[in-house]
Amino acid sequence: MIRTKVAAARWIGRLSRATGRGGGTTLPGRVLLKLDPDAIDKLGASLRNGSTVISATNGKTTTAAMLAAILRAAGREPVHNRAGSNMTWGVATALLEQRGDEGLFEVDEAWLPEVAERLRPKTILLANLFRDQLDRYGETEALADAWVEMAGALADSTSFVLNADDPLIADIGRHTGPSTTYFGIDDDGRAVTEPQHASEAKQCRVCGEPLLYERAFVGHLGHYSCPACGLARPEPDLSATEVKLLGMDGLKATIETATGSHSLDLPLPGLYNLYNALAAIATAQAIGIPPGDSVAALSRMKAVFGRAERIRIGPSELSILLIKNPAGANEVLRTLELEEGPLTLWFALNDNIADGRDISWVWDADFELLSGHVGNVVCSGTRAAEMALRLKYAGWPEQDLTVVRDIDRSLEVVLEDGPERVFALPTYTALLELRELLADQDSATRYWQS
């Protein structure tokens, strides 16, 4: 009976693509789950080598792409929701559309407990939890509580890979089994002494007292301890040292493991991508791939859809950097700070459901970092005026700010003088609009094909 339902859902996917209504990354799964609510359980059980599940607020698409590249280099082709459709229907679509012996699924933070209960994965990577879409998710502690409950239920059957530098994630290790791997950064030169915003401060998950930070790397990720109960950051099994950031050209670091050191040359920018790489290498090790092999595979890594992706449009190179919350935006801004100015920038701030209706997060992002480092700036999207206002208050020259709400027209405006490089910073639905626009112009493939 499941075969008939799968066939019907596959036909829906082919029809969706043929009629130009999308890439068929969600609709087939929605149809299948309507026909059989237990389809994920049944199809997941057919993966002979089990599945790996990845979740995080920031970086899950890139980390999943990194792990997929590592697996392919090892001769293992996973069933993978690579287009980033990461709720139940996206996972179901990947399971019915692809064939393979093991699964690799990025999963939305709120949907993770349900997907994990259905898939019973061999390995779960939990990379970070940041404030994001508060109108949808609520505070991060609520998600952490749900993840703790999930981890306890799976502790006997699932290996966990956890970010030692995120106190919300590391705490989950108190509830997992012995097969738990930690990763983190150990480079004082890339740290500040504490999280930069009060909203990023964290309380001890054991006793509730404020944590003290020895150093912080990205938002609340860092080295911390509790002065009240003695809780401390776990010692990582894999860590990054000797970090050198090269702006948009990538980064270099040494990856320290129990079996030796490996030189990572990653062609993706920023500390956030170093965390993504560490997460992928640690997870690959948990599923049987040596760190040295993973490091070699990542040296050939290409940017995924909208995550430091570069696209040529006539004489201009468009670098696309997704922003969706303060922590992620700050890391993009820190990366751009290393670029030679003045910078040509294109912002697209939307407030659609998939972006989060609440755009107040832009006031917590450090746009002040680029004050005095910018040239032509175009703001677009449904909340273009609010984006321009935020930049004005960040000290960006008002005469350099242009508001063009329409994404199509705004792109024409920012490109009309043929700048050598344009840095595009869209929110999620604006990124989808941008990619479709570029695909219509034959400048890029559609997002589900990238």
Model-derived features: positions:
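Phosphate-binding loop of NTP-binding sites
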Residues: 3-203
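Short polybasic/polar patches that bind polyanions
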Residues: 31, 72, 260, 285, ...
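Buried hydrophobic packing segments
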Residues: 67, 71, 91-95, 277-287, ...
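Short glycine-/acidic-enriched loop or helix-start segments at secondary-structure transitions
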Residues: 90, 114-115, 135-136, 171-173, ...
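Acidic, Mg2+-coordinating active-site environments of NTP-dependent enzymes
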Residues: 126, 130-316
